[in-house]
From Swiss-Prot:
InterPro entries per the UniProt record, alphabetical: Aldolase_TIM, Methyltransferase_A, RlmN_N, RNA_MTrfase_RlmN, rRNA_lsu_MTrfase_RlmN/Cfr, rSAM
Taxonomic source organism: Anaeromyxobacter sp. (strain Fw109-5)
Gene Ontology annotations for the cellular component aspect, listed alphabetically: cytoplasm
Additional facts recorded: Reaction proceeds by a ping-pong mechanism involving intermediate methylation of a conserved cysteine residue.
Catalysed conversion reaction: adenosine(2503) in 23S rRNA + 2 reduced [2Fe-2S]-[ferredoxin] + 2 S-adenosyl-L-methionine = 2-methyladenosine(2503) in 23S rRNA + 5'-deoxyadenosine + L-methionine + 2 oxidized [2Fe-2S]-[ferredoxin] + S-adenosyl-L-homocysteine; adenosine(37) in tRNA + 2 reduced [2Fe-2S]-[ferredoxin] + 2 S-adenosyl-L-methionine = 2-methyladenosine(37) in tRNA + 5'-deoxyadenosine + L-methionine + 2 oxidized [2Fe-2S]-[ferredoxin] + S-adenosyl-L-homocysteine
Binding-site positions, S-adenosyl-L-methionine: G177, E178, S209, S231, L232, N233, N307
Active site annotation, chain numbering: E102 (proton acceptor), C350 (s-methylcysteine intermediate)
Binding residues annotated for [4Fe-4S] cluster, in chain numbering: C122, C126, C129
Alphabetized Pfam families for the sequence: Radical_SAM, RlmN_N
Protein name (database record): Dual-specificity RNA methyltransferase RlmN
GO molecular function: 4 iron, 4 sulfur cluster binding; metal ion binding; rRNA (adenine(2503)-C2-)-methyltransferase activity; rRNA binding; tRNA (adenine(37)-C2)-methyltransferase activity; tRNA binding
Length: 377
């Protein structure tokens, strides 16, 4: 007698906010509607950031009812909002399945930037990053990525800090997660965010940061026009192996070769992010090696003094060492900028995002003891 079979699971309903225009066109055709309805939906969802189907006031009620049956619509619930003394705002968003992710808004006189998350947690495991202590819960969908932008835009207007449907000017994919490890969702989200019928961000104002997934760096360069940032943080393989386990798979030589072949458009440069860890990677010898490593690559270096995280065994560099490091790079004709510490008082600075598994979360394991890094070669 054969064992009973479980009934087949129904296909999950597509998420409207994750659908590019061509998918919307196929959807409305399947529902018996004319093609112009797809562009109408696209504008509501991606340009105006509609939070519910009820907001689609010029879409027939019958079509809205059919969409409600055939699809879902990604929404993020704002779980917390924290404002720093410097004006930075950190939002924690709750997803439909109860996961928590964070976005950080950084206003400046000439721009309004949102730091966007791409995953719930992160599997890369950089030893100086609090997000890395969480592990990876799951990837975010394209809709969950772009919804961070829509929700931020709406909230900025509510707070009186911007006007129009899109007060944000810049996006940086430097939040929770490794964006290139969720490339499929990232690519769809980028297409939606750059769309003329959507938020219409300029590719010059969108930056994707990676810890060094070499094959996906090449893919990003081939398939999108956005800017690239590399989280480098070390000048030898021995150093980087200890700080960033991904280096054991894609060592510095491979990473830098991918950077050299990355298409540079309109005189733009690759940004190399370098977190300065006191007594670990902040020697002047490191600065000299860094200049040598990036030689021949159109480069901007962002120096990031380490932001202290309780439970992680690192310390910030001495202020005078930061200046000396920067001057050593400048003497070798490198543009090096010391990034301002934004939102440190609300744990919104670089390496501090951990909506789940943070220092106060009893589920978070104790960090391993720090061992001395191998001597730089």
């Amino acid at each position: 007698m054969s064992a009973p079979h479980d009934p087949p699971r129904p296909e999950p309903r597509p998420d409207l906010r994750s659908l590019p225009l061509d998918r919307l066109e196929r959807l409305v055709a399947a529902l018996g509607e004319r093609p112009f309805r797809a562009r109408q939906l696209h504008r509501w969802l991606q340009q105006k950031g509609a939070a519910s189907l009820d907001e689609l006031t010029d879409v027939p009620r019958a079509l809205r009812a059919a969409l409600a049956e055939a699809t879902t619509l990604t929404t993020l619930e704002r779980a917390t909002e924290q404002r720093s003394v410097d004006g930075t705002i950190k939002w924690t968003w709750r997803t439909h399945d109860g996961k928590l992710v964070e976005s950080v808004y950084m206003p400046e006189p000439d721009r309004r930037t949102l730091c966007v998350s791409s995953q719930v947690g992160c599997a890369v495991g950089c030893t100086f990053c609090l997000t890395g202590t969480m592990g990876l819960a799951r990837n975010l969908t394209p809709g969950e990525i772009v919804e961070q932008v829509h929700r931020a835009n709406r909230r900025i207007v509510e707070l009186g800090e911007g006007q129009g449907p899109r007060p944000l000017t810049n996006l940086v994919f430097m939040g929770m997660g490794e964006p290139l490890a969720n490339y499929r969702s990232l690519k769809v989200a980028l297409d939606l965010l750059l769309s003329e019928d959507g938020p219409n961000f300029s590719h010059r104002h969108v930056t994707v940061s990676t810890s060094g997934l070499v094959p996906m760096i090449r893919k990003l360069g081939e398939e999108t026009p956005v800017k690239l940032a590399i989280s480098l943080n070390a000048t030898t393989d021995a150093q980087r192996d200890a700080l960033m386990p991904i280096n054991r798979r894609y060592p510095l030589a491979q990473l830098l070769e991918a950077c050299r072949s990355f298409p540079i458009r309109n005189g733009r440069r690759i940004t190399f992010e370098y977190v300065l860890l006191g007594g670990v990677n902040d020697s002047l010898e490191d600065a000299v090696r860094l200049a040598r490593l990036v030689r021949g690559i159109p480069t901007k270096v962002n120096l990031i003094p380490y932001n202290a995280n309780p439970g992680l065994p690192y310390r910030a560099p001495a202020p005078e060492r930061v200046v000396e490091f920067q001057e050593t790079l400048a003497a070798r004709n490198l543009t090096a900028v010391v990034r301002k510490n934004r939102g440190g008082d609300i744990s919104a600075a670089c390496g501090q995002l951990a909506a789940e598994g943070g220092p106060g979360d009893p589920r978070r394991p104790a960090p391993p003891p720090l061992t001395r890094l191998p001597a730089a070669g």
